[in-house]
């Protein structure tokens, strides 16, 4: 249960029991009955991210690229990345910011996509995963901690069973 490292032992025991009884998937399915969101393209993701950014981080630098990345989870063991590329243009240094979200998020509920987008947007202001970072995440998404935990449960479910709970191809 690598995704749940650092959580208290009694909580981990509850998760082990849910896994043993094959009830973890059903629990998550009940919690997120709406299923998969309809943000399936890079263009739609860019629109969604810039909408959240303009709502909560108007003064932050603009994003030059936002995209789903097929290789992200496998290569970097990450679900999202934020990068800043600096280039010399004329006599000035110009920075381009981009956010990449693992393609896994095409097939999950909107709440989890929002959680990872909020996480990556928070990195535009706070580099480290510290108290200020999580306070910013909680400001943008009040249920951030629960959503992150539920996503970790889902990743554990995928790791143990290999079965997705929602199918992106059957969304409304």
Task: List the model feature ranges, each with a label.
Residues 117:
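Histidine-centered acyl-transfer/condensation active-site motif
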Residues 120:
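Walker B catalytic acidic pair
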Residues 1-114, 124-172:
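Active-site-proximal or metal-binding-adjacent scaffold patches in catalytic folds
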């Amino acid at each position: 249960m690598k995704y749940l490292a650092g959580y208290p032992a009694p909580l981990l025991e509850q998760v082990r029991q849910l896994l043993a009884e094959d009830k973890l998937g059903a629990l998550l399915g009940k919690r997120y009955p709406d299923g998969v969101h309809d943000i399936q393209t890079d263009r739609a993701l860019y629109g969604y991210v810039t909408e959240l950014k303009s709502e909560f981080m108007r003064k932050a630098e603009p994003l030059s690229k936002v995209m789903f990345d097929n290789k992200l989870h496998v290569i970097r063991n990450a679900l999202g990345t934020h990068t800043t590329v600096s280039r010399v243009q004329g006599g000035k240094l110009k920075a381009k910011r981009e956010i990449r979200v693992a393609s896994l998020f095409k097939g999950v509920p909107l709440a989890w996509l929002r959680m990872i987008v909020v996480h990556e947007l928070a990195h535009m202001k706070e580099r480290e995963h510290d108290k200020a970072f999580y306070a910013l995440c909680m400001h943008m998404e009040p249920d951030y901690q629960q959503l992150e935990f539920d996503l970790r449960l889902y990743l554990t479910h995928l790791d143990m069973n290999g079965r997705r709970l929602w199918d992106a191809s059957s969304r409304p």
